[in-house]
Amino acid sequence: MWVRTVCFCFFSYLFAGEIGAAIPADFIFHDKPVDALCFFNMEGNEIDLNQCGLAKENYVMKGQNSKLIAEGFIGYNWQDPEFSDSAQGYSYYKFFNAGEKLYWLYTLNSGGGTGVFTAIHLVKRKKADILNLETLAGGDRCNGGLQNVSESNHHLIFSQNLTAYDLIALSKEPDPRVKAYDDLAACAICCVAKAYYKVDSNAQLKFDYVDLGTIADTKEMPNQGALQSCFNQLFISYIAAGNSKLTQNTLNEFAAKFKQTCTKLN
């Protein structure tokens, strides 16, 4: 009991003053910012703020990531005291005003393992102790993990990590014969590109483009899957030709070339 009480007071102290004054009332609960753990392992589209957070989980606070705090995130690192030798987890969020009492919420969570779970939600305060929440996008590292989140002209802009399988799946006519893992890399550490999106306050998600990056050698790419080697050669050829930014049309062309060149090898 003493440990939990001290940590809770420490938590309150860290979020008092300047940070509390900077966030909207919709993210204040019991005179403190909404607990970041409320946005981890959620079920349904409502959050009861009385039934979530550090105290409800019986976790202890283990400090903060100063870099994330400096970037405007709210949250902390935590640990389950029943497993004091285990790695620490963390929960952070950053809000963006979507207008009309709506907010885009970018969340970062880890349970202490290798997973890094990121998501974007559209959030509204329904009652004093209830948040409504709609998840717009999310994933774990290369399996749909989110980065580069910012607000511009009343839209939220972000990137989503893609595996080779995800990249082909984004095209208008992906080959249904191509299977994740068996044919193309789809693991959580198999990133090859980023897809960029825009979203408005009506939760309309719009694909913008894919950035293939600057990889110059197939040795730097994943090798999981029977068709991955052929995919890698096609991928590198696009970058070498200066075609690293793919709109929907050029992405469709890439997928068509992959189908023509690589799937016949299977």
Label every model-predicted segment:
Residues F15-E18, M42, Q51, M61, ...:
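Intrinsically disordered, low-complexity segments enriched in small/polar residues
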Residues I19-A55, G145-N266:
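Acidic, small-residue rich beta-repeat scaffolds with periodic aromatic anchors
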Residues T5-L14:
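Bacterial N-terminal signal peptides
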Residues E57-R141:
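Short N-terminal edge-element motif at the start of the domain
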Residues Y13, Y59, Y76, Y90-Y93, ...:
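Sequence-level detector for tyrosine residue identity
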